Amino acid sequence: MVSEATRQAARARREEILEEIEKNHLKELYPGSGKCMLISGMYPGVWLEHAYDGVAYADAVGQRAEVARHQIDLFLDGQREDGQFPFRVTAAGREYSHLQECVPFALVCDLALRRNGNAGLREVYEKLKQWDAWQARYHTDERGRLLTFCGWDTGHDHSRRLADFGIYETAATTEARDRPQQHAVLPLIMPDMNAVYYGDKRVLSEMAGRLGLPAEQARYAREAEALREEITVTCYDAADDFYYDVDCHGNRRKIRSIGVTALFVSRFFEREEGRRVFSRYFRSPEYFGTAYPYPSIAVSDAAFEKNAPGNSWNYYAQGLTMLRSLLWMDDYGLSDDLEANMERWVTALTPRSAVPFGQELDPFTGAPSSASPYYSSSMIFYLAALRRLGI
């Protein structure tokens, strides 16, 4: 429960956040872009993994649907002729060195379009088809599994998942299609990245159905299911009831990462499987069920360590994880858990601190890390929580 004192303070913080967003985050990135939701001073511009920020903000404040559309247009307009989307758009330009999609962009586009009368559905669908084809051409293996070429493909900075990537822990080249050569473990097959790829195909199938394209609807549904089967065979460990990364030699790398939540976001998990995995891992303090959910690595894993003062996907509970939980927890029948998470984050974020509304929290104490004050995902989740909790 959120105390009455915290509830009163939170109402004042809400006004502060709205003012902060209006002043420093809702900006045109370049002439004609329309106002978009920028991330923070630490992270200029908008990353592809933050495309959902526009939709989430519009939902959290109950208006400003145009921001959701402007957010996706940053990437749709930046698509190369070969189909690749930029991983980041800033006032200085567009960058294409890695993937870092993290949430199915097709899903975000669908949500943004629905909030804007579905205008331009066919045009967006065609662009998403090109993105799917680009990934198939440059970033998959012979079995259709999406490959991880570098650490930044994942968005999980400082995670032990990337421990032996060497120069590829970040992005070693300026082109996302450049494949590591003769590397000890790369390319990897990661369940979260493949779930995102699956999610894109799943939404493409749904869009094709709405557009009256039954052959394409069936094709993308078939490809999505084939990918799900491949990733289950490759990454699923029945004894642990968990999905793990697999290296280029077929070895499973047994780190329980918060990346598993991408399998919920993308609806890779059927409802029963998702609820089972959630009950075992997310309600237990041995894994992800900490006081301030959810740590980026299960706390009982040998890899779990506070290895950086901030921006660590090896320890902290991330605002991004919480914001993305709005995309799946209700649909899996986990509404009570979602609201409990909201109460904990509101309790942690409301008191004033040196890093207001930062990127991440200590999963045990709720103290902010050093990373990124006034971080978009944390602010938007806070607004969504206040709205939902009636504060």
Over which residues does each language-model region extend?
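Aromatic-rich carbohydrate-recognition surfaces in CAZymes
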Residues: 44-51, 55-68, 72, 77-166, ...
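Extended, well-ordered alpha-helical scaffold segments
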Residues: 5-20, 64-77, 117-136, 200, ...
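Conserved small-residue packing positions in alpha-helical repeats and bundles
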Residues: 55, 198, 205, 261, ...
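Extended glycan-interaction surfaces of carbohydrate-active proteins
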Residues: 2-45, 69-95, 144-188, 229-316, ...
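Amphipathic, soluble alpha/beta structural segments
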Residues: 221, 299-334
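Short, contiguous, pocket-lining structural segments
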Residues: 185-199, 216-219, 223, 255, ...
